[in-house]
Structures are given as C-alpha cells and as structure tokens.
A protein has these predicted regions:
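N-terminal low-complexity segments that are often proline-rich with Ser/Thr-Pro
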Residues: 1-2, 326
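Beta-strand-enriched, solvent-exposed domains that form extended recognition/catalytic surfaces
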Residues: 3-67, 410-482
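Beta/coil-rich, acidic/histidine-enriched accessory regions frequently appended to metallopeptidases
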Residues: 306-442, 458-464, 480
C-alpha cells in the first residue's frame, strides 16, 4: 500500500518532475532537482481509503503553502500570495488545480482568486458532466491540472496537464487564465480548447485532433462564461452557411472543410439540438458511455472506420436518422487521402462504404429529427476574443428560433437588385439557398445576400429553408420572373 505514495518535485518550467516512492517508516531521499514537493497517495477507489500520516521535516526547504478554495478565503489569499517564497504557487479547487507563477499572480490577482477558481472548477465540472462522469459513485479522485510555463507555445496540452505560457510577460495568464480577464469576450476558449485535448479521445480521429476538442471550448463558453456574465455573448461558433457556401457546395468532402464546421457540425450541433433545445439532455452522457464501452474504431484514431462510425453512433444512440444533415456537409463524399496530424494517417472511404453505412441506419427505420440541424448555430449576438462586437443582429438559424419552433411566414418573399437578393419576412427561416440547373450552388444566413460569386442563369431559384424537417423548402424567387 505504501508503495503507492510518492514524493514529487515539479520545477518552475512546469514540464519536468522527479518521483520518489515512499515506504512505511523513515524515508531518507536525495532530491535531484529544485521545485515544489507534493505527496501523492494513489488508492484503489473501489475500496475504502485508509488514512495515513506523512511527516516531512523541513530540512533545507521552505514552506510555500497553497490556496484551497474549500478552506481559504480571498483574505487568506492576499496574505499567502504576498508572502509566498517560491516562484510557483499552488491553487487547489474542487475540480481543478493550478500551479502558476507567483510573480504574475501578485501582479494580476493580488487581492482575490476565488472568481478564478470558480471559473476553472465550473469549466471542468461542465466537461465531466457532459461526459456522464457524474453518473459514477466516485467519478474522479483527482483534479484537472494546469501549469504556467516559462517558455513554449501560447497554450498546450499534455497527457498529464495543460500548460499556459508566460513568455508574453504574463499576458496569457492575465487575459486567458485569471479572472476577470478570462471571463471577457471569448477568452475562456483557450482553457477549454486545451483541456478539451485531454477529453476528446472518445470522439476524435486523425484530421479532427484540433477540431473535436473545440466542442469542450464552446461548451464552457455557453455553460460557464455566459452564465457567470449573465448573457449569451460569449461564443466562438460561426454560422454553418459560411462553410456550406465556401467549401461544401464545391463538392469538398467533409475532411477537407476548414474552420468551424469540423467541430461545429460534427459534435456541437448535437449539443445544441439535444441539450440546448431540451430535446434529450441525456444524449451526450449516454453517447460518451457508449464510446467508453465500444470505441469508434478498433485502432485508436483510425480515420476510415471512425468517420462513418461516428455518424452511425450518433443515429443509433439517439435513435434518430440524421442522414440528411450529414449529407448536407458532404460526410459521405468519397475520399482517398494520406495526411499527418500528430501522426500519419490514411483516410479511404469509397462510395460503397458510405452507401452501406447509410443503409444500416435506414434499416433501423429511425424517425428524422424534428429540426434541420445542419443550419443550427449559436453565432447570434457575439463578440470576438478581445470583446470587439462582430455584428449586432441574430443571423438566420440562431438556436433561439429553433427553441421557439418558429415557422416560416406565409408572406416570405424575395426580390433581386443587381447581384443582391433581398428577402422580406424571412426571419424565421433556418437559412436560404440558391439552386441553378437543379443543383444547390449557395447557402446563406441572412435576409440580404450577394449571389455574384455563384452560378446564376434563367434556371436559378431562391428557397427559404424551414427550421422544421416536416416542412419543404419554399420557393421565394425565380430567375426571369418578377
């Protein structure tokens, strides 16, 4: 039992450590590096924890102390951080633990830290909850670790902790780690993105490694930053029509689409549909449990198998046929590609493979979803990373319209003025699309849009797309007719 204890030293660089096993009785050890010391007591959580006592005589070392949100107040913090002798200081929350540079904690948070701990704790708690960890009697006997580092990239994630650089004179800590800076605009995104790397594995495969983790980043903007700030302003989700117009209508397979669509549609749109709209708030916890029991692919991160398996798993877990939404994003367009993302991968999906996958879902005879989620988003009234207003009106497809079950106006119509299409009474549409020669050539998210970049002739038509799957597209403009 005692072999499971360890004494570790963590250097100010935050990326190196040494471990020293402890036995019952007197232990005499020689520390090989300078740093902070931690006693780690690893137990089997299926058995009652046996209390132990570890006494550490302070020889040549110095007591640094640590802040524990369950025991200390901001008044304690002010005293502790003011006297801390070491270059790093520990902050222990209920679900999180940060080891940050003392210099910048004194500079940017000298009087209080509880708001920061609340933000970190609630972020980790939200991620654990969406994965269904709260369903277990003792889901975790540990905390999510973050460390500020003296050099390296802006932010990064390892298997053990997330790192936040101070190479920019502490600006990352000030603006994207510590409150109030981290709660302004979309700045909590960075922490969510990096911690998301630690949790993305069940629904990740190569080519998605810098995308699927953004599900967690957007999740905590929605559930933490917006809730604490009392508004809906924090979001880094873009309207899908941008990518449908730029990439999808040109025939690119989903793999080749850049930006938001990689995570916005593949993962986050199902959070909006099931959780934000209240259709099935248990969808993601059940899905993650399914993924823990049966991974998407036999070989971790294998692309060809996981890509189609994700589509089938979403449909099977929800007992809903989302095929039409996946088709809009070219999920089934054949591809034969070799790439590298944290390792080489090969992605080959033939038309036969895609057809067989869709047939397996069709055979289940699941109902279609209530709403068209391919256009569902949370872009709305938003700000960017530094608080600058991006636009002042909600675009078509914003989630609140779905929540209201808003229906197309019977008087929705459109006219063309030069290259501009102007829609009237179209605020309840999920989106608009243009077809030429019977093929969709553009999707649009607002009631006034430019069609000069798409093919246009006498066969061109403009349709309003209803939110409801049960309602057909409505023709609102036909080329050659007034």
């Amino acid at each position: 039992m005692y072999k499971r204890q360890a004494l570790a030293s963590v250097s100010p660089a935050g990326i190196e450590s040494s471990a020293y096993p402890l036995d019952k009785g007197i232990n005499k050890i020689k520390i090989s590096r300078s740093g902070l010391l931690y006693v780690m007591y690893h137990t089997d959580i299926s058995k009652p924890k046996r209390p132990i006592t570890v006494h550490i005589p302070v020889g040549s070392g110095t007591v640094n102390g640590y802040f524990d949100v369950t025991r200390h107040t901001d008044k304690d913090w002010k005293r502790m951080i003011g006297k801390a002798p070491h270059s790093m200081f520990d902050i222990v929350g209920r679900y999180s633990m940060m080891i940050l540079h003392t210099e910048y904690l004194r500079a940017y948070s000298p009087d209080s830290i509880t708001k920061s701990v609340q933000t970190w704790d609630e972020s980790v708690k939200a991620m654990w909850k969406i994965m269904g960890f709260d369903k277990y009697p003792q889901p975790h006997n540990n905390r999510q670790l973050g460390v500020s580092v003296g050099n390296g990239v802006h932010m990064f994630a390892t298997w053990y902790y997330c790192g936040y650089s101070i190479g920019d004179n502490g600006n990352t800590m000030k603006n994207e780690v510590i409150a109030p800076g981290v709660l302004q605009g979309n700045r909590l995104w960075g922490i969510g993105h990096e911690i998301g790397h630690c949790y993305q594995h069940p629904f990740n495969w190569r080519s998605m490694s810098e995308s699927s983790n953004n599900f967690f980043a957007q999740l905590i903007l929605d559930q933490v930053a917006n809730r604490i700030n009392g508004n809906e302003r924090a979001t880094d989700m873009e309207n899908p029509c941008k990518y449908l117009l730029e990439d999808v209508v040109k025939g690119k397979p989903f793999h080749d689409i850049n930006g938001w669509a990689k995570w916005g549609f593949a993962q986050y749109s199902f959070y909006l549909y099931f959780h934000k709209l209240g259709i099935n708030p248990e969808f993601y916890p059940v899905l993650f449990e399914s993924l823990r029991r049966k991974p998407l692919a036999k070989q971790q991160y294998e692309v060809s198998e996981a890509h189609l398996a994700w589509y089938e798993r979403v449909c099977n877990v929800s007992k809903t046929d989302f095929t039409e939404d996946f088709e809009i994003f070219n999920w089934f367009v054949p591809i034969d590609y070799k790439g590298n993302q944290y390792g080489e991968y090969s992605f080959k999906m033939t038309e036969e493979m895609a057809r067989a996958s869709k047939a397996r879902i069709a055979a289940k005879r699941y109902p279609k979803p209530k709403f068209r989620i391919a256009f569902l988003h949370q872009h709305g009234k938003t700000v960017n990373l530094w608080g600058k207003n991006l636009h002042g009106s909600e675009l078509n497809g914003y989630w609140t319209k779905y929540k209201e079950n808003a229906r197309l106006s019977s008087s929705v119509s459109a006219t063309r003025k030069g290259s501009m299409i102007v829609v009237r009474n179209g605020e309840n549409a999920a989106a608009f699309c243009v077809t030429t020669n019977g093929k969709v050539v553009g999707y649009y998210d607002r009631q006034q849009f430019d069609v000069s970049s798409v093919e246009w002739n006498d066969t061109s038509r403009v349709y309003a797309i209803p939110i409801q799957v049960s309602e057909p597209y409505k023709l609102i403009y036909q080329a050659g007719k007034s």
